[in-house]
Swiss-Prot record:
This is tRNA 5-methylaminomethyl-2-thiouridine biosynthesis bifunctional protein MnmC. HAMAP family: MnmC. The lineage of its organism: Bacteria, Pseudomonadati, Pseudomonadota, Gammaproteobacteria, Pasteurellales. Pfam families: DAO, Methyltransf_30. It comes from the Bacteria. GO terms for cellular component: cytoplasm.
């Protein structure tokens, strides 16, 4: 796992932060804010362009986040723009920034003291600051969204990927001076900038170095000099004047935004955790959202448990998936905290999650996690005694502890968040089973079991294990997984439990109902909802076998036969599916010879997709952790916005991945 190294920072006589890595100041000793405004805002003519654009959002990318000064300044300026021109088409600002060496929190706070006018923004950033791993973290600042990419920009910038071709409006070409940081100021940087910049998109920078100017010109930009700030004689600005076709490297995996009109009308099919987070993210973008749920009530299936564990999946041989779950976990915490701040009530406790090395196989798995050397705030290997102290009960083994993990009530969260969203305009229709989708010229026609029809511009499928019930999705390789969660009464000993325990199952601390959740069975290709005495007994046997040498497990008693059955949606590689619904037949026709087309470097068509039809599914048993970030990514895709995921992860989430993998190898894919 690529750890991110914090910056080595000291403060000079003017109290300006100085990087030891680059022996350079983070901003001007004289007036860093005025310099930022002159170089980047005036250099890119932001105020004028914001007034003139007909787009709903504007995208800025920055090389070097530093203290966040440029971000604070442009966020404040954009708020002034929105107040001055409330009826302008432009509603949202996206700020993408790259940082190899983030400041430690203490130094970040000290640097922010120089700019009290940004106190509110600075405090919000400080509260969100973390010990990051490589990749993208998304943060919301009202109408401005910050995508902060930690790690080496040479690795991260290409991960904006095919999707971001021709999408960036303006670049803040910042970072330490070229003479101090030559690794960044390379031709590859300018080439990526050009690839991602819109026609008539711009850049500005404080430097006028000849090598930088020549590199930008060679990449394709029209470059001009203007007066530098303060004592500096000159600085550079430029524009991508020529229209260029998108440079697409993996057309078979290219995702496509929706074709939207103003006040987009979007249908969400499903009433669980994926649906509620999708509704939230879409509503924030101004969509008219209608939710169709076939059950009598919301959260009636896999999202209906009384307690569920919230923590990242850290045990995988593919580091991409670990990165995904760590970023999803960080974003999920933001979303759950947002719900708490809004007064949405749901039982929860950020009590931590203990992972037990209960046998040889699990010990190897936890050893692999320890070898990742994750930040202790995320994961800490602990001895038997230390782990026992964290959970409040003796454990028979060593393990690991995720201090920021939690349990919460999925059922309460989903139902009460939908109630909240309904007060904000989301329309919720229960007992409405959609049985067919038909594409019309400008919309989708949804037909219900009762024979009613509804029209919507965009449809999002978030209906769990019933994802494949439509003609357009019947080829997706997902399957149902039955899970029975036992609800057991607490006891004198069990009531001492103060963290979630995971073994070959899990046990939660007691809820307000004085019960614990003990989970869970896992039966593939089984969608039965009836109570199973055998599974109830097996849930008890698992904990008493895995943690056999401690007495308190004998107080775990499932004989009350209280349980809840949910049907999860999963897929063989256990990775969620997200994005466009692929046109299976057309893709097989277009890509039957994909292996040779690629080998011979022939032109390859973009992946055939069902227009304005999207999905979020196959969340398995990790929906509490993955759904918030997946839903936010989906809403960003629908609205043609930057995505908070690296391309290597996004490709793995693509719903066509199973047959594309085969076709890329030259293997045959069966139809039907």
């Amino acid at each position: 796992m690529h750890k991110v190294q914090f910056a080595d920072v000291h403060f000079n006589a003017e109290n300006t932060p100085v990087s030891a890595q680059f022996d350079d100041v983070y901003f001007s000793n004289q007036d860093g804010l005025a310099e930022s405004h002159y170089i980047f805002q005036e250099g890119n003519q932001l105020w004028q362009r914001w007034q003139q654009t007909s787009e709903a959002h504007f995208v800025i990318a920055e090389t070097g986040f530093g203290t966040g000064l440029n971000f604070f300044a442009v966020t404040q300026r954009f708020r002034e723009f929105r107040l001055t021109y409330p009826d302008a088409p432009l509603k949202r600002l996206f700020f993408i920034s790259f940082e190899k060496y983030p400041l430690p929190l203490a130094q970040l706070k000290r640097a922010h003291q120089a700019y009290p006018e940004f106190q509110s923004l600075a405090q919000q950033l400080q509260q969100s600051w973390l010990e990051p791993i490589v990749g993208c973290y998304r943060f919301h600042f009202a109408e401005t969204t910050l995508d902060l990419w930690f790690g080496d920009m040479a690795e991260n910038l290409p991960q904006l990927g095919d999707y971001m071709c021709n999408k960036i409006d303006a670049w803040f070409l910042d970072g330490f001076a070229p003479s101090k940081n030559p690794q960044m100021w390379q031709d590859t940087l300018y080439q990526h900038m050009y690839r991602y910049t819109k026609t008539q998109g711009t850049f500005s920078t404080f430097t006028a170095a000849s090598a930088v100017r020549k590199g930008l010109i060679h990449a394709g930009f029209t470059v001009t000099k203007r007066k530098g700030y303060g004592k500096k004689r000159e600085c550079l600005q430029g524009v991508k004047a020529q229209q260029q076709p998108a440079d697409i490297h993996a057309p078979w995996a290219l995702v496509q935004p929706a074709e939207l009109t103003e006040n987009a009308d979007i249908a969400l099919i499903g009433g669980g955790i994926a649906s509620v987070f999708s509704a939230l993210s879409l509503l924030e973008r101004g969509a008219k959202v209608t939710v169709y749920c076939e059950d009598n009530s919301l959260a009636a299936n896999a999202s209906g448990n009384k307690q569920g564990a919230f923590y990242p999946q850290l045990s995988d041989d593919d580091l991409r998936y670990i990165r995904f779950y760590i970023h999803a976990f960080a974003y999920g915490k933001q979303r759950f905290n947002w719900a708490i701040e809004q007064g949405i009530t749901f039982e929860h406790d950020f009590c931590g999650v203990a992972l037990c090395a209960y046998d040889a196989k699990s010990a190897v798995k936890l050893a692999k996690i320890s070898a990742l050397q994750l930040p202790p705030s995320l994961y800490q290997p602990l001895s038997q005694q230390a782990l026992s102290e964290q959970v409040g009960l003796p454990l028979p083994c060593d393990g690991g502890f995720i201090a920021q993990g939690a349990w919460l009530s999925p059922q309460q969260f989903v139902q009460n968040t939908f109630d909240f969203l309904a007060t904000r305009g989301v329309i919720i229709k229960t007992q409405q089973k959609i049985t067919a989708l038909e594409r019309q010229t400008t919309h989708w026609l949804l037909t219900t079991e009762q024979g009613d029809s509804f029209k919507h511009q965009v449809v999002v499928l978030a209906n769990g294990h019933k994802l494949t019930q439509f003609r357009q999705t019947e080829h997706l390789p997902v399957y149902p997984v039955r899970g029975q969660v036992s609800e057991i009464a607490t006891s004198t000993e069990l009531s001492k439990l103060k963290a979630v325990i995971c073994y070959d199952g899990y046990l939660t601390p007691k809820a307000a109902s004085q019960t614990h959740c003990l989970g869970a069975s896992h039966l593939r290709d089984n969608a039965e909802r009836a109570f199973s005495l055998q599974e109830q007994q097996e849930n008890q046997q698992k904990i008493q076998t895995n943690l056999a040498s401690v007495d308190w497990v004998n107080e775990v008693d499932t004989r009350n036969n209280q349980a809840r059955i949910g049907i999860r949606c999963s897929v063989r590689d256990r990775i969620p599916m997200l994005g466009n619904v692929p046109d299976f037949e057309q893709q097989l026709s277009d890509y039957h010879n994909l292996y040779n087309l690629r080998r011979r470097k022939h032109a390859i068509k973009h992946a055939a997709l069902h227009p304005n039809l999207f999905l979020i599914g196959a969340l398995g048993s990790r929906g509490l952790t993955s759904a918030p970030l997946l839903a936010e990514t989906l809403a960003s895709l629908i609205y043609h916005e930057p995505l908070p995921l690296s391309e290597d992860i996004l490709h793995q989430l693509n719903a066509n991945r199973s047959w594309i993998r085969k076709l890329l190898k030259g293997s045959q894919v069966k139809q039907g």
